[in-house]
């Protein structure tokens, strides 16, 4: 009995550092996430429309937005594995304010929104780089985030789209009262 207790204690002591993890400083020369900040309101935020729905349907962006979301633009089909539970435009049914965000050295129009019937759990963030050639989006679906990228020079993967979108979202949260998304209907 005593021997099994000692083995268990030893196993706990050996596994605790592994399961707790450790913080390792970044390697010299590596960079962290890009710095993002919300810019003062100006007319650039409204160049493609005054609301999320106007931006999604703007003639200059319409085809790019549909290409950005691909198959997720349309309503899901039964048995569609890996698809969203709603069509991408529904994540912007209730749109928040359009804002300008600077990430690193680029300015983006930031459009937030949520699904009318599930505003707390179905949220969207769309970034349109100034000039409209690069688009990135994050659709949050009850704990899962789906990232989309479109345009020349837009990079996916761990150092790309997800990191840029997360930086933008943090900046928008700091500039608002904690959540840049529309509030659920009462």
For every predicted segment, state its role:
Residues 71-138:
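Mature extracytoplasmic domains of secretory-pathway proteins
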Residues 23-25:
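Bacterial signal peptide processing site
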Residues 2, 28-29:
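Intrinsically disordered, low-complexity segments
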Residues 18-21:
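C-terminal motif of bacterial Sec signal peptides marking the signal peptidase cleavage site
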Residues 1-10:
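Bacterial N-terminal signal peptides that target proteins for export
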Residues 12-16:
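Alpha-helical transmembrane segments
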Residues 51, 55, 59, 63-69, ...:
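C-terminal partner/receptor-binding element of secreted or periplasmic proteins
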Residues 29-51:
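Post-signal peptide N-terminal segment of mature Sec-exported envelope proteins
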């Amino acid at each position: 009995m005593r021997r099994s207790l000692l083995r268990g204690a030893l196993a706990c002591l050996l596994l605790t550092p592994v399961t707790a993890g450790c913080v390792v400083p970044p390697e010299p020369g590596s960079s962290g996430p890009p710095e993002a900040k919300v810019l003062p309101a100006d007319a650039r935020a409204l160049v493609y429309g005054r609301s999320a729905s106007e931006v999604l349907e703007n003639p200059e962006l319409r085809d790019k937005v549909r290409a950005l979301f691909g198959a997720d633009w349309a309503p899901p089909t039964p048995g569609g594995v890996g698809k969203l539970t709603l069509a991408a435009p529904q994540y912007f049914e209730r749109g928040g304010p359009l804002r300008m965000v600077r990430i690193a050295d680029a300015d983006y129009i930031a459009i937030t929104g949520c699904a009318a019937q599930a505003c707390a759990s179905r949220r969207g963030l769309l970034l349109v780089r100034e000039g409209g050639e690069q688009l990135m989006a994050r659709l949050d679906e009850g704990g899962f985030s789906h990232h989309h990228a479109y345009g020349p020079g837009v990079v996916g993967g761990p150092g790309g789209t997800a990191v840029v979108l997360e930086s933008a979202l943090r900046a928008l949260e700091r500039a608002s009262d904690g959540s840049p998304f529309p509030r659920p209907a009462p």
